[in-house]
Amino acid sequence: MKNEKLKVDNHIHNNIQFIDCLEFWVSNAKSFIKSFLQPMNFEVIGTRFNDERSRIQYLLLNNVISRSNLQNQFQIENNSYIKPIQGNQFIKVTSSISPNDLDFHSKIQKHGDFIQNISFYCNDINLAYNKSINNGAKSVQLPMKEYFKNCKDIVETAIIESPFKDLQHTFINRNITSFDDNNNNNYDNNKEIFGNPLFLYPEFQEIKDKELFKIEKEDSSSINGCTGSLDHIATCIKNGEMNYFVEWYRKCLGFKLLSDKDSVATDESENFENELILDKNFYVITKSDFKYTKKENIGLKMAVLSNQPLNTSFHKTPPIQFVISEAIQGGEGQIEQFIHYFGGEGVQHLAFNSNNIFKAVEIAKSQKLEFVYIPQSYYSKLDERLKHLFPNSIPKILKENLMKFGILIDSDAITNTNENNSNNNNNNDSQNNTEINQNIGYIKQIFTKYINDRPTMFFELIERSNALGFGKGNIIALFESLEKESSGSQLKSD
């Protein structure tokens, strides 16, 4: 039984629509959730064991109104789809409870806590799977259907290996019809259904121990949206591998290099997708860009892949963005450091959207989540560095909040001037303020400290104000801050 196709947003050119779920493999799930995910407004809503009962898995969702009552609080379309405007993201956290689970324990020993699976919601999983396999991807699981609730609910999945070792990609599609009696199940009469988010994950059971992950927090109306959907996934690869990874995602998943509207191809040709254009869709940062690092051989090459459309007349932040950072030859920076301690190439950090980054950081810090320290010297140079964005000077209240919470700010590499960009936030900094150049987008970012003892994975919060790309200045500031932390020279706890 085939479910109705989703209404495809005009900013998506691809069968692959958005990132459905991220799966962590961690050594201690409860500790990981309480230490890192709950401070970013994620709530545990479900749990399950695998068939062998050797692993336990928790399902988390952010912006949950009430974990004690999940009914009628979640917007679902086409019996299968979460409306992205809600700013939600599902995460699975998996941990082994068996000493004999050698595959799990060997990978944790090699990588530490890490991202093991990135799931993509697809209109047609067979199309996505066949395209990837025909272009060289390796199969993990053939397309299959799982039936739940007396065969009323159907979840289709297929799994492939990604080009990153020990990272898999799942293609998923749903046909969920068994809503509760309070909802009208007739799709023709109800284009949007409000229900329990667990309807979309029927293999999970609602968590029984309501006290297990209970935390004291502010009223949900004041914090929802502080941490939203995934903005981008940042990865690290070895020197000389950029073309291979770009080609793999282009051919196997149909992604393209993120660029501004003047550079978007006007037809379905693949020539543009395959071309790395310096300072358009491909960036190089060298030692000369750094002012405060002591290391001599430091830098990176960076490209951003996305499911941005091939032909568009306007900007809109794509729902999928993969940042690929390549190490330099003989380098000593954070990219090379990640590869060494992680045991190869992989996901370095996840960035989540925020509609109020100051509030999000305040809440996270109140729950003991630690962020990298940004030296005051960074803020002393802001007026000069961002003169093109703030012709007079940075508004006083904005600068004070940036310094108070340790947040970076930069104009993006690709400016988005589209007023209808629903993925970007309202520009709270410029309301009734003529001091901002409205034609230039900008971003505010902050990064957590490493979540492992190894200097490998961390998280990011990002607030976009009419911005599409990434700021080069913030990348440099992050490099220098992480160098201080990993070298042990950072004595101050933020």
UniProtKB/Swiss-Prot annotation:
The keyword Metal-binding applies. Coiled coil: none annotated. The keyword Zinc-finger does not apply. Fe cation binds at H232, H349, E460. Binds 1 Fe cation per subunit. Disulfide bonds: none annotated. Its EC number is 1.13.-.-. Residues 18-174, 229-408 form the VOC domain. GO terms for biological process: tyrosine catabolic process. GO terms for molecular function: 4-hydroxyphenylpyruvate dioxygenase activity; metal ion binding. Keywords: Dioxygenase, Iron, Metal-binding, Oxidoreductase, Repeat. Gene3D superfamilies: 2,3-Dihydroxybiphenyl 1,2-Dioxygenase, domain 1 (3.10.180.10). Pfam families: Glyoxalase. InterPro entries: 4OHPhenylPyrv_dOase, 4OHPhenylPyrv_dOase_C, 4OHPhenylPyrv_dOase_N, Glyas_Bleomycin-R_OHBP_Dase, Glyas_Fos-R_dOase_dom, VOC. SUPFAM superfamilies: Glyoxalase/Bleomycin resistance protein/Dihydroxybiphenyl dioxygenase (SSF54593). Its cofactor is Fe cation. It comes from the Eukaryota. Belongs to the 4HPPD family. May have dioxygenase activity. PANTHER family: 4-HYDROXYPHENYLPYRUVATE DIOXYGENASE, VOC DOMAIN-CONTAINING PROTEIN. This is Uncharacterized 4-hydroxyphenylpyruvate dioxygenase-like protein. It comes from Dictyostelium discoideum. The gene is hpdl-1.
